[in-house]
Amino acid sequence: DDFDIIILELSSFQLELIDEFRADISVLLNVFEDHNERYGSYEVYQKTKTKIFLNQRNSDYAVFDDFYLSEKILKGINPLPKHVLFKDNEFNDLGNKISQNGIIKKFLPALIKVTDILDVDRNFVINQLKKFKNLNHRIYEVCSKNGVSFINDSKATNPAAANFAASQFKDIYWILGGLSKNNDLTKLNLSNKNIKKIFLIGSSSDQLSQIIPKKVKFEVSHNLENATRSAYKEVLKNQKGCILLSPGCSSQDQFIDYQERGNKFTKIVNNLVVKC
């Protein structure tokens, strides 16, 4: 009762439990294959995500990529709230003016649509976005020194998220692997021309080693500390590069969660690089 607006980020696990929950404005962002060990197929996972629209009224709003309308994933939801569609490349020019931050540009269309519904001044939105800093474990720069950057993207627990992170950098020394969750790891873009070397960790190492293209250098590092230290040695040889922890897999084979994994990476980096 003390707030005018409450913003909730809901996982598929939480959406499974929806009974009476109703959103005035619901937003469906990117839905890529994940949690196959739980749902068995991408289609079931996708359908679970659409539960965010349940219980909405005709006067409410559903904000989603127009791709989902063509895929008919809203079929069966009745009554259907007002549609507010966006496209991935919508507001590209505005995004380039605001920031080179890939996360901002990726989600700007949905954000603009929601703030327009709420009648928030566009200039206010733009000014706030210019101040935006990535959250920890989400393409977060731990350190940058002497041409070497360390990026903590431990939250990237599926191939699509890892691919997005890797698309943001050049001269990448990529720390990859963990618990696959039965996801299709062949969807990882391991032919990315900016990859210098891949360092494999966790239980998916053997599986990943079988699908890495022959032209791409890699080593099986087994654990995060070995991978980070080995990547640092490699990047120092070239005197520039990005050591990217974006595992594309869950962390529970070696860690409690992605946060513990990301914090471990940060600690290793701080021990490696003095006065970063």
Kindly label every feature range from the protein language model.
Residues 78-91, 126-130, 140, 218-225:
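Beta-strand->loop->alpha-helix junctions that form or flank phosphate-binding loops
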Residues 100-195:
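Nucleotide phosphate-binding/pyrophosphate-handling subdomain across enzymes
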Residues 248-275:
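Glycine/aspartate-rich loop-and-adjacent alpha/beta segment that forms the canonical ThDP
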Residues 67-74, 181-184, 204-210:
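Short, charged/polar "capping" segments at the starts of alpha-helices
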Residues 185-242:
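C-terminal helical cap/extension that packs against the catalytic core
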Residues 62-66, 175-176, 194-203:
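Short internal beta-strands
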Residues 2-86, 90-99, 251-259:
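Flexible active-site lid/hinge loop adjacent to a nucleotide/diphosphate
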Residues 9, 29, 45, 83, ...:
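Residue-level signal for inorganic ion chemistry
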